[in-house]
């Protein structure tokens, strides 16, 4: 893992004729979970090679578990420093780069622009603190965000903030809501779980779940 952080990404090999190579960076577990539908759609199209990277060890393990049959290569994202990033870029040679949510890696994006590779931000988010910081350092913000060909915002509020900073943004919705379970939980297991949580096994009991109560995520 450490060698990959330095840019020594495993050689991906020659590109397949007729396919574009997508480098998708999802920082950790939440983002890795969320990008499943996107990766599977790219794979199903039959015209994409997928290189998936993540920043954390837990994200890496989850990526291997979930997407070994989807991604052509899974690895660790390089440190966002010129020598490390440039080395990884020479090894991966992507045609498209995709970042998820609030990830802004200036050197990674600079490498994309220098090579004429389009960069996209999906599920784009700007928190209250980040928005204030972007407004305060507007010149730096424009330099970084200006590398994206397109910004797909996770909510109307996020899109409004991107626009306030001078960047066009479309609202695609939060891709985390697109993640569906592969199969329903068996009734017996469902009843056991309800009992363990103190709700009782009666399926008629109404249970309200607040799964994500961070400001801006309540629905």
Residue ranges and their predicted role:
Residues 1-184, 213-216:
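Active-site and donor-binding regions of nucleotide-sugar-utilizing enzymes
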């Amino acid at each position: 893992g450490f060698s990959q952080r330095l840019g020594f990404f495993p050689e991906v090999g020659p590109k397949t004729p007729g396919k574009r190579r997508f480098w998708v960076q999802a920082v950790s577990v939440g983002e890795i979970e969320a990008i499943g539908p996107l990766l599977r759609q790219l794979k199903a199209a039959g015209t994409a090679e997928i290189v998936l990277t993540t920043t954390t060890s837990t994200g890496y393990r989850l990526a291997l578990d979930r997407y070994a049959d989807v991604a052509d290569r899974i690895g660790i994202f390089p440190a966002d420093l010129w020598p490390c990033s440039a080395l990884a870029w020479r090894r991966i040679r992507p045609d498209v780069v995709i970042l998820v949510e609030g990830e802004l890696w200036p050197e990674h994006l600079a490498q994309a622009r220098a090579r004429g590779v389009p960069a996209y931000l999906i599920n784009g988010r700007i928190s209250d603190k980040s928005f204030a910081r972007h407004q305060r350092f507007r010149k730096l913000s424009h330099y970084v965000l200006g590398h994206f060909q397109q910004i797909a915002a996770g909510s109307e509020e996020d899109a409004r903030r991107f626009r306030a900073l001078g960047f066009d943004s479309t609202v695609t919705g939060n891709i985390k809501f697109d993640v569906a379970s592969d199969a329903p939980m068996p009734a017996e297991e469902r009843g056991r779980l309800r009992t363990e949580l103190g709700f009782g096994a009666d399926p008629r009991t109404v249970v309200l779940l607040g799964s994500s109560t961070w400001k801006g995520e309540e629905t």
